[in-house]
């Protein structure tokens, strides 16, 4: 938990999921402060759009202006809602939209936290292009090291004249004025053929490894079990290639695709519809924080390629939460399979949570682990 006085109001903010680390990561950064310093409340006219507000620092500060919080992270929405409540601000003060929704017309102010993925930034700038005017104040912010020439060129290409500020507390801002430059259309998804399958994989802008199959998933697919039945989960599904493979290998099983990214879940849905339409009725698609709210003892197996970062920050908090949720939602003798970088040492984490862990396969970079939910000892 951390405190920030941003000039609009004094806030106490925490990350989501919350951690008990001795040196916890902050729920806000200098770029949030720097963005807010640029605004005079008297100049805010028209809708306020906030993009990629990781834990709600901007939304909480500007809540009295009824901002729209736009992004591709359900975790960020949950974190923002929690911080609104914690600071005594009505959740209804902020309207949440995912990045593929229609943005409000003629915004007065647009604040953008520059996302990690340049493709997501381009998708969002193209969406803004449809609604902003020459009078819209457009300001983006990030750590100085995360603003590159390609970032500035993208703003110029999609929206118009762009300048950058001096660094302040290692943060930098981008100021942009909309001038309606000529711009060719771009497809909503990027597609590629998955070798040895005949499948075409479709990827929205914010999907991990959207330009091709990542090597961890490739290794995982080589070792997926067959002859499973009941309900199984592709947890943190991304574009759904693991779930697709499970559907093909296990015709008696139903697959639940889960991710905190609406773009990921929509990509998974599109990939099942396109490649295995006959299996669509065996699928469920869920935008969720891991398996929050899912009843215990529901699933026969969970498959997971857990992230070890949250936006720009390295952390295993999300993976740790995924493992705990998987154990709660597995039936007795249900199995959790994960693929991970070897250096993360998830073997001991799984053994601590499940009481057991086995190595299924390993190579010079990745390891596939299995843990089994055991019954209570008598």
Swiss-Prot record:
Subcellular location: Cytoplasm
Signal peptide per UniProt: none
Reaction catalysis annotation: guanosine(1835) in 23S rRNA + S-adenosyl-L-methionine = N(2)-methylguanosine(1835) in 23S rRNA + S-adenosyl-L-homocysteine + H(+)
EC annotation from Swiss-Prot or TrEMBL: 2.1.1.174
Keyword 4Fe-4S: no
Pfam families named among the record's database cross-references: MTS
Gene Ontology MF, one: nucleic acid binding
Cystines in this chain: none
Top enzyme class: transferase
Keywords of the record: Cytoplasm, Methyltransferase, rRNA processing, S-adenosyl-L-methionine, Transferase
Domain of life: Bacteria
An individual GO BP term: rRNA base methylation
Gene Ontology CC terms: cytoplasm
Homology family: Belongs to the methyltransferase superfamily. RlmG family.
NCBIfam families tied to this protein: PRK15001.1
Function statement: Specifically methylates the guanine in position 1835 (m2G1835) of 23S rRNA.
Protein name: Ribosomal RNA large subunit methyltransferase G
Annotated gene: rlmG
